[in-house]
């Protein structure tokens, strides 16, 4: 046999590396990153151009003449669910001054009471709170002398006495029995007068 070394192998160390011919070798399971290339004719973006800074979303710009439901008139915002406290209310029984017609004032419960102003006493106003005059004395204010009084009552023969008298005659009561209803005060009309000035106030009629 010859002692000469064998010829070099074509794929041996003297052959150019595969990476120099076609780049890095392909590794299974690994993909090279894709590079976005601009279309032909469009210049590349400059590296100095940065995206616009991020701005947090602010309040929408209202249209002229529109006030959002949570915005005050001066442009400040109120938190949701906030309601202004109610204004002061007048105490119970207080009636604010107003243009009421002469001769009447608002009474309790929304009723209108009658005002009696005697001649010569323009500075004194008497309000009668709708007293009910019946067959018993009533505490009231005299519209004539302007004093707090209890009325004085007197009985007078009225329509009910005559009706009951004719009814007795129809039933056959004679010899003066038909006059018995005229003697009973519970069937007579009641007249209320002032015990101080003796002035007439009201008459309660049993039968109108």
UniProtKB/Swiss-Prot annotation:
Biased segments, Pro residues type: 1-13, 50-67
Alphabetized InterPro entries for the sequence: LITAF, LITAF_fam
Gene Ontology CC: one annotated term: nucleus
Keywords: Apoptosis, Endosome, Lysosome, Membrane, Metal-binding, Zinc
Region annotation (Membrane-binding amphipathic helix) ranges: 164-184
Disulfide partners: none
Bilayer topology term: Peripheral membrane protein
Claim: DNA-binding is one of the keywords in the record: no
Region (Disordered): 1-70
Single GO MF annotation: zinc ion binding
GO BP field: intrinsic apoptotic signaling pathway in response to DNA damage by p53 class mediator
The keyword Nuclease appears for this protein: no
Subcellular location: Late endosome membrane; Lysosome membrane
Domain LITAF: 122-206
Binding positions (Zn(2+)): 142, 145, 194, 197
Domain of life assignment: Eukaryota
Cited Pfam families: zf-LITAF-like (PF10601)
Function text: Acts as an important p53/TP53-apoptotic effector. Regulates TNF-alpha-mediated apoptosis in a p53/TP53-dependent manner.
Annotated family: Belongs to the CDIP1/LITAF family.
Domain comment in the entry: The LITAF domain is stabilized by a bound zinc ion. The LITAF domain contains an amphipathic helix that mediates interaction with lipid membranes.
Descriptive protein name: Cell death-inducing p53-target protein 1
Chain's gene name: Cdip1
